[in-house]
Amino acid sequence: MFSFFKQIFKSLKKFFFLLFGIIFVLFSIIFLETSIVQLSNNLVSTYTTLVSKTNSSDIVAPAILKEANPVYIASLTNDSGYFSKIKIDDKKINYLFPYQENDFGSDSGQSNGSGDNQNKTIPRKGDVNEKDKLFLARKRGILKAYGEANIAEKRIYKGLAVSFNNTDSFNGSDISDSITNRHIISDPQNLIYDASGNLLGYFADGLIKETISLRAGIARFPGDKGKSTGTQVKITQKQQTNNDPQKDSTVNSLYKTNNKDKVWFKSDETKADNTDISANYLFTGGNEAANWFPNLYANIPIDLEIDPGSQFWKDVNPFKEIVEEFQTQKESKDNQSFTLTFNLDISKLNKLDNEQLKWLETNAKTIANNSSFGDWDLENKLKQLKKFELKINKDWLKKKVESEKDTILNSLPGFSDSDKDTIFKTQNGMMVRNNNLSFQPSSNNLQLVQNQNSQASNGIADPNFSNVQTAYNKIHQSNNTPEKTLDAVYAAVLDQWRSIFQEDLVKKTVDLLEKYRDHFLKATAFNNIDYSKQNIAIANNVSSAESASFLVSNKDEQRYNDLSLIDGVDLKSWLFKPEQNESNPLDTIYGGQDANNGFLQKIDYEFKPSTSSGGMTASLKNTQALSPKSTKFPIYPKLANIIAQAQLPEATNIPTTALDALKQWTNLDANGFNNLKEEDKRKAANNYLALLSYFTPAFQDPNELIETNRQMLEIPITVKNGVNPLILPTDQQNLVVQTPEAHGAVVSQQWLFRHNKEILPQEGEYAWKTALQTPNNFPNWLNDLPDRYKFSINGLTFAILGIGESVETGYPVLSLQSPLPNTQDEALIFVNDQAYRSILFAVPAANQENYYAFKSTDLKQHTDQDPVQFIANRLEGYLDVPRSDLAFNVKDISKFNYLTTARNYFPDLVQSYLAIVSTVIAIFLIILALYLIILLIKSFIKKNQTEFSIIRAGGFSTTKFIVGMSVFAGIVAIVSSFLGVLFAFLLEGQVKGIINRYWFIALPENSFNWLSFFGSFFITFFVFEFISWIAFKQLFSKPVNVLIDQGNETKFSVLLHLLKHKSHTMSPLTKFRVSLIVSRFSRLFTYVGLSSVALLLIGIAGTIPQKFSAAQTSTSLNRNFNYKLNLQTPTEQSGWYAIQPYSHFGVTDNNNGIKTLYNESVQANSQNEHPYKPSNLKLKNRQDQPIKAADGTELELGNLLLPSYGGAQQLNTDENFFRHASLSKWIIDFPIRVGGSNINPWEIVEKSIPKQITQLLSASSDQFLISVLTDDFFNNLNANGFLIRNPRTNQIQLDASRVLTTIDVFNPGGVKFNDSFLSFMLKVYGDFELAKQDSKLNFGIVPVDPAIEETYTYVEGPFGFQEDNLDENSPYTLTGINPESSFVNLIDGSGNSLRNLISSDQEMNVIVNAGFQYANNINIGDYVYIKPKNTATRYSEKFLKAPLNNSTVAFKVVGVSTDAFGQELYINQHIANNLLKLSGNQGRGIIRDVIKKTNGQSQSSDEYEIDYVKPNGYVPFNGVFSKELKPSLLNKALVLNSIIGVWGNFTDFGNNFQNLVRNKLDKVITSILPTDPEIINKLAQEKQIINTTSMNYESLRKELVNKYKTEWNSVNLLSQNASSIFGNNIIAPVLNIDAAGTSAQIIRNNAEVLFNTVNQVDAFLLGTIIPFIFITCVVLGISMLEEMKRIFISLKAIGYRDVQNLISLLTFFIPAFVLALLISIGVLAGVLIGIQAVVFNVAQVFLTNVFEFLPYMVGIVLFGVTIFVIGSYFWIKLRSAELKEGF
């Protein structure tokens, strides 16, 4: 046996190459299979493990609930009812004084300085130092609540004056609207009561409001100390002179108050220790003091709650006396009301609403007792929503018609202005007005001060109920035409009110249902079922280069929190809430179960009847049920303590815990409110203030604070009814609680590594626990944190707590434009709820997805039903989705309801795909391996056949032969297995990288796969041994002597046959060579297969990148831009877009239509215009020199909105306020303190701007200011402290005290920037490079800098290739370019320019790109057809009854550009403008203004005209090419456009619009009517204007304007008709923020991601598989030579030269390689066609039709090297061989 092993080892040398070949092939098999199987297993096992360890859900139900749509049925009856007895006649100046003036005492020792004896006639009850009752605690408490922190003993205190809110007057003074002469104010007579006399609310034109609008303030008491009643204020009759009122000269002095008493308030930072209220949170304050004048401008708007609900609420209400007056001063009248009864139609409710309403009724008491929603009276509210009776005073009805008889008919259906003479019989009346105002208090402490009016009858009769009811019932009958009677008018008004109130009822019902939706579902459909509500948002980041977009996952409040933390701080531990613990995630804010620590710890009290005194008393609520007369209310002791500490610095007994505060409250309430008086009057007032703080916080539901839109809690320190007990510095009007958790995030592993970020360390100054332990230092900690530990999203900063992953975000689709996510550049982050909401607020156009998630294993515990069907059945009738989509498994690839879950099936798909690929490769390589093993064993046996036969004859068994062969088997198995697994381990990262780039799940780290090693070893070993057994079994099936004889024979049969055979056509050697190929056909097949695969892979790896590169090169030659931005086509009404370089935004450019916002002449102390002069707004350079334009004019910053009181006024009065205005957030976003009230101009503007716009501005504004302050020049200029960092928001803002002029309450026009700051600001914007970094909101001006931008005009509409077959939803647009464009080159395949083909303005030619030609198989000479729809007249055409016949336009294809990205069609821009009707002489241009006609005279007429500007060289456009990688139009300039040409503070035709255009109908109609001559002519014909053919354009349009003035003669008619034409989205962004997805840059980015991936695959192929194949070819060739060595040596022996033998060898290899080359080229051609189709469909990239032979040259060279190696080996062996070796 030993000898046998020795013989085998000797033979190894002879079979080395064949043995090496086997080892290499097996190595390849093991390497590839191990890699692929390991990757597949990693993917699937990782996914499975993740599902298991994260408690992940696998069933999804869309959170798309059916919308509530309740229906109410209304009926009209006549009924008795209660009505207010309080009457106000004049409705101009109406004061209510709850107290007598002498209630607050008089300073007997102080003289008024006049010596008038009338001073002594003031009624008073004694000196303030003697009579305690003059300082009743309640009244002093009210004063203190209004800011009188230090009440001087010797001081006259004026009472709290309350006036009804006059929206057309200014602060109660005698100033009315000079244009309308209308006084719309609150009237107590409009209070409305229910059938039992309970006060319901205030009736206002169809609505019942729960509040009445008042104004209040101690500074507004008319009169002054020492004045007698005879010298009280007299307000003169207003005289109109230039619309300005004239007052008595004494008014100003009489209205001024004594401001000598100042209060200085000092705020100390609250320490963060264990017992303090600020545990774990920061309360910002600082040692700043605020100078506050308590009597200055104290005019506070009040929305007074009419019915507080209980005596307790009255007692803590500063307007208790007024409320009581409203409640008690009522009377019952018979037949005085029209009663509208509203019944909810239960039969019309959907299943969700019906069942939820029943659930609410059943659980109303439970909800009222335990809810934090504030619905303490839910049961009664539900009853009212099901049936409500609205009692309308018939006097209101008459007064409505009477006061608006001149305009009301135009607002009523079926009536018009022409019916006035028929319906109303007018009598001339006389008005008598008494202007003497009396302020003497009445006996019941209520005085009504009013102008007395008397008015004669004007012919308006009282409504007759029977007649009105008859007319009312006819209104909704079909084909009803109302009679022209007064009763029909009354009925129409009632129906209007019915409609308004019905809508209000519907809204209230919908709001209530939606408020409890989740609670209802949890209690019903999801009862006893565990579920989570997933919240995921795709957010774009505009303020940081760290990442283009983030996938943000809210991991708060989830039952199935599928966050798996790989490393870092355990975010999940403090987010996940077990089922048994439903506390808020921010428990330390609310207190959790520890009442001593919760900042917003709520304690429930109830106010109930006292058994002893018969009054009402407050106590802790200790019963579940409330008595019928008791009221539950919450108190927030710690919040009250903070207020008390801030308000009462002299107080010494401030509790520090909730329990102490509870005791204090108990003491305060011990004797009831009626016994609050104490000897210490100051303490009594303080107690009253404390009560206000406890019981009237500004919020009812503390949970609202969690839904903050910033990474902190901001709590307004105000209480109800206008009382503001906390006097803080200007920038600290809110209590700010910094919540560190909202600044923490877990990120994806791939993104962390890509951006060189790190997780926070566990210890040290940068550890997370350090931040939590010192919350008062958190902002500084965050600022000091190195960049590697944090990242930002649009100004929000997050510390990196760890890296993690989750199932539901494992492989998401982040964009429809780019289906493959890019985990290297796109970040996946996990945050808590507060951070999630903050991101949604700071991110523009965030795409949010919400759905319910369930776990099938949990559901199976509740039912035997299929879990998906179980959930579907539970939700049937609740969700607004098809029955089949109510629920589905996340791996169901047919349900692409959510982008983020659309790829959850990916692991299974990858596994299947890799299994198929690995199987195919494995089969091929296994066949090859088996072939080589068989060849090795066969060759080895044949080589030693004689020796084996002799050994066999000596008694050697077959088993021993097999054991001997184990040497071969062992060497092959161990070497191939070890190397295969080792290389798989070493290269696993590369294999994973191809997939891992597009998956947010982190794959496990590489590890040596011992299982694969041992498995492959044993499989290889036993396969080798099995084949050996078969071979020996077959060998020894013959007798031994036969075997010995066969082994000694010389096999010359083939050679001898060829040598003896005579042939006339082929020499013997040639025949031998042919026979050599044919006799080894199996090897030929193997070589051809291997070579074909190698060449194919080389061709793919080399050709496709070349095609990608060619596509990029050809596209770059055609496109000299990065972005193509389609804008909203300007309308006729809006006019052409003005253009300016972005760095010049805000600069006046009159020649280009940008008119200044400011006037050079500013009226002194004006309150109605901007206080800025253009001459004072000239831009300066750093040397303080004016900056000039090219024509030498000095540039003025006259179009940047600057803060001013006049600007705030114009915002609500100027319908052209925003025309060509620029707005920068930092300039106006700071609090301005005006007489005790805070004004933030940005907040005013923000209300009129779409949310996504304001979010983007908010996100990027701070970045600009950082750039300003990091510039040394401007940082030095900021030494005055213009710019400061707000410590509580951590953002830079202006300091009002340093940038504004001194503010005088009587000169609000003083709200303006001072000269020092103006100089600073003008230098900032004079630095154009710096100015480009600012984000500006702009109206009507598009940023176009000729150096980096160029305009174009695109045409869209129905498109097709046949004139009669157009696709209405075609995605194609025609891009009209300047034929001399420097941004679009249009190069054909030969490198020639095609632009001259579209240079003509007359020829309708189009050039298409290669992508369009490929997608549509179109050729030069073909035609395309389009019907333009984005015309400038698209809205003007809607004025016509019969639309214009817009014809289809044909374009001839005259060229194909090599542009390969996307599908493009290019035409001449002038032709495009003509198609869109942007060109033309009349009604076209940049609209500078709408002005009154002058008619050639100095004075203007009453007619208006549009002032157009047509700059030289200007070409209309609706699109912009940009070379910038981050175009200002996309990242900085947010441009809004008004499609109606009116530029006011509105976005629709609602209240803002109506208020602005009231009495400006002529001007507005002039603006919004069509200007196109063709439409004007057709519209004139429809309006039956005669002699249209003889009129010129101006005359014809004038006639139309006059016609529409008649038809649209009211604001309501204008709004209704205009909204039907223009829709409601009338001021909108010119560029949709989402539209960037269609830009060239995005397509290019997607393509580059795809290219990079292909290159990675190519590198893998070239680096691993291809070398395997070539080495295998070399090994096979050498092994074949070993077999044929004897033949060639024999040929050499008989005289054939070595060269001839070498040629004989090449005749085998060369045909094999040529055949392989031909096969690979054919297969590659088919593969390229398929790849081209796939790439174009996925990435819209046309791979150019190029075939690269260079890769094949590389392949041929490699094969040449292979043949050379084989030939060299053959040559060496042949040269050194002796003849005996051949035998």
From Swiss-Prot:
A single cellular component GO annotation: plasma membrane
Membrane-related topology note: Multi-pass membrane protein
Location in or out of the cell: Cell membrane
Main location: membrane
Coiled coil ranges: none
InterPro entries named among the record's database cross-references: ABC3_permease_C
UniProtKB keywords: Cell membrane, Membrane, Transmembrane, Transmembrane helix, Transport
TM helices/strands, residue ranges: 16-36, 917-937, 967-987, 1010-1030, 1084-1104, 1660-1680, 1709-1729, 1730-1750, 1752-1772
Region (Disordered): 105-125
Compositionally skewed regions (Low complexity) per UniProt: 105-119
Any Pfam family: FtsX
Annotated family: Belongs to the ABC-4 integral membrane protein family.
Protein name per Swiss-Prot or TrEMBL: Uncharacterized ABC transporter permease MG468
Organism per entry: Mycoplasma genitalium (strain ATCC 33530 / DSM 19775 / NCTC 10195 / G37) (Mycoplasmoides genitalium)
